[in-house]
Structure formats: C-alpha cells, structure tokens
Amino acid sequence: MSMADQLQIPADIKPRDGRFGCGPSKVRPEQLQALSTTAAPLFGTSHRQAPVKNLVGRLRSGLAELFSLPDGYQVILGNGGATAFWDAAAFGLIDKRSLHLSYGEFSSKFAAAVAKNPFVGDPVVIKSDAGSAPEPQSDPSVDLIAWAHNETSTGVAVPVRRPADSGDALVAIDATSGAGGLPVDIGETDAYYFSPQKNFAGDGGLWLALMSPAALARVESIAASGRWVPDFLSLPIAVENSLKDQTYNTPAIGTLALMAEQVDWMLGNGGLDWAVKRTADSAGRLYSWAEERDYTTPFVADPKLRSQVVGTIDLVDDVDAAAVAKILRANGVVDTEPYRKLGRNQLRVGMFPAVDPDDVSALTQCVDWVVERL
C-alpha cells in the first residue's frame, strides 16, 4: 500500500469542497442544477432561435453589467476558447506589428501565434523570468500591445493600465484567468478577452472579448483591406453574430448556461467588487500561511505581483510537493499540482470566486497535516 493510500486526512480539517484547480475550476452545485432545470429545454434546439439567443443575450448583458462597460464597448464571443482568440486577434486586430509581454507559458503563446502569422510583422517581445513580469510599455513601431492580466502558469498578476505614449495602439489583455476575479477598469483596454473555465466556473471551448470602439473599428478596417482570414477565426463574423446574440457556428449550450449562472451569482452578491474581495480574502489566507511556515515560500517574490486567483507556493527541497499533492488527491483534495512545464517543487492553488475562502484555510491545514507525516 502506498503512502497516499495509507494517510487518511481527518474529515474535520478537510475542505467542504476539495477542488482547487486553476482551470477547469470548481463548478458550483447550483450551476449544475440549472442545467437540468432552467437550461434543460434549450438542449437540442436551434441556436438561431429566441430561447438560445436569449441565453446568449443574458450572458452578454450580465458581463456588460459586471464589468461596467463604457459606452460603445461590446461583448463579443466565439467558439474555440482563448487559444483560438490569439489567432483571431493576429488576423483581425493587429494591423502591422504588435508588442507582447512574455513572463510565462500563456503570455508567451500569443506572441508565438503572432510570429507564425504571415500577414503581420515579427512581434516585439519583452521577456522576464517566470515569477516576475516586465512593466507594460509602448513602442512607436507597434499598433497593438498585449499582456496577460494573470499568468496562470506562474501566479503572476500584472495590473491593467494603458501604457504612456501608446498613441493609437490597441491594448489587448489576456484575462483568461483574471477576468471576474481581479480588479480592472475596462476603459484601460481595447480587447479584454477570456474563457469560462476559470473565474466563471464553466467549461472551455468559448472565448469572450470586451471590445472598445477602437478595437471594433480596427476589425472593420482590416476586413476592408482584403486580408484573408479563415471564417472560423474572423472577428468581423464574430462581431456580426454577437450583436445578434448568437455565435457563427453552434455553441455548447451547457457552457453558456454554466457561465450565465455564475455571472448572475456574482451580480447577485455584489458584482465584481464582491468577487475581487472574495478572491483577495482567499489569497490573503494562502500567502500568510506560506510566509509563516518554514517549509513554504510564495513563488512570486514581489507581493505586488502575487495573484489573488492563482497562488503558487514553493516547498523546500526535502518536502516532495508531488507526494503532498498525491496524498491530497487521494483524500479528495484535488488539482494542487504545479503547472506541468514550470518544473518546480510547488503547489498551485486556484482561488476563483466559486472557491470558499474557508476551504482555502482548510487546504492549508491539510498540507500541514500531510507534511508532518511525510
């Protein structure tokens, strides 16, 4: 019998819900219940008809309220997830050249996608080591500036502020794991894009972008230039359909319904301010615990860059983080493993709004209990 099978964490210290993944993340039971009640009649029906279009409209209006969209901004959506949006943006938002801040797996991937696109110039890439981040900056040669609000692989959060002297350059923010859990002024961005499976406790396969009038105008001007783009990645097609409360091709009803329920739940509890306070509460508990123990250290050294939705905690060399995560998993406390490519002796904890801060405290107690017995 393995150590993971032998160690049974006492029930009275375990979290009520043991899901701490950084995406897919915890889905609340009430969301799942809605799939079999209010959303049930929509399954197996046309996405071009009123019932499904009303669901899309409910989601779009909910996001507009949650993020207090400035005048002229629109909620645009399409199938494929944020990964597809990188290519869509390379085709449809970059006129000639872009600048990218690269400080982890996901912030680097948009730059890599742009570098492969034959219609735009080589991107300017400003890099920093994992666990840190470059300062957002402008460059006179670029017409789009991109970075990640929250780098999911490392737990680094970079505030969203339009760089000085950026001129007409669009600001595109990958908010895949930041939207809905971190503070943001959407007016500081032109394309704030994300997916449902992080803060919005849904399934993947969908991208959403909060787009400014300048971004929408860029989409139109690039389309008018005659640049070729696959229809699936066409932002003009996505905009046209989104304004009709639909998607270009068939969406997953469950994904839309789960996310709409989560957005309504956030709004009902106080909106984005409430969600941000909740994730900050969870993060405060995790980082204070990590700083108090002699076997743990927050991976992100600068407290100002530490994410309040994805916490990365290094363990000392003589405590095997993989063994700790394995024992936690055997006890129903799951998805605390680090990002696979980071290669650190580390635990990674998702602290999205669906996660109860008390469960984060319980997780830390479980880690202490396990480490004492290794």
Swiss-Prot record:
Encoding gene, per UniProt annotation: serC
Q: What does this protein do?
A: Catalyzes the reversible conversion of 3-phosphohydroxypyruvate to phosphoserine and of 3-hydroxy-2-oxo-4-phosphonooxybutanoate to phosphohydroxythreonine.
Against HAMAP family, the record matches this protein to:
SerC_aminotrans_5 (MF_00160)
What pathway is it annotated to? Answer: Amino-acid biosynthesis; L-serine biosynthesis; L-serine from 3-phospho-D-glycerate: step 2/3; Cofactor biosynthesis; pyridoxine 5'-phosphate biosynthesis; pyridoxine 5'-phosphate from D-erythrose 4-phosphate: step 3/5
Question: Where is the PTM N6-(pyridoxal phosphate)lysine found along the chain?
Answer: K198
Localization per record: Cytoplasm
The protein's matches in PANTHER family, at most eight in alphabetical order, are given as:
ALANINE--GLYOXYLATE AMINOTRANSFERASE, AMINOTRANSFERASE CLASS V
State the oligomer form and interacting partners: Homodimer.
Q: Does the keyword Metal-binding apply?
A: no
GO cellular component labels: cytoplasm
Q: Which UniProt keywords apply?
A: Amino-acid biosynthesis, Aminotransferase, Cytoplasm, Pyridoxal phosphate, Pyridoxine biosynthesis, Serine biosynthesis, Transferase
Could you say which protein family the record assigns here? Answer: Belongs to the class-V pyridoxal-phosphate-dependent aminotransferase family. SerC subfamily.
Q: Which GO terms describe its biological process?
A: glycine biosynthetic process, by transamination of glyoxylate; L-serine biosynthetic process; pyridoxine biosynthetic process
A Gene Ontology molecular function term of the record: alanine-glyoxylate transaminase activity
Signal sequence, start to end: none
Name of the protein: Putative phosphoserine aminotransferase
Q: Which residues bind pyridoxal 5'-phosphate?
A: A82, T83, F106, T152, D174, Q197, N249, T250
Origin organism is: Mycobacterium avium (strain 104)
Question: How many and how are cofactors bound here?
Answer: Binds 1 pyridoxal phosphate per subunit.
Q: Which InterPro entries match?
A: Aminotrans_V_dom, Pser_aminoTfrase, Pser_aminoTfrase_mycobac, PyrdxlP-dep_Trfase, PyrdxlP-dep_Trfase_major, PyrdxlP-dep_Trfase_small
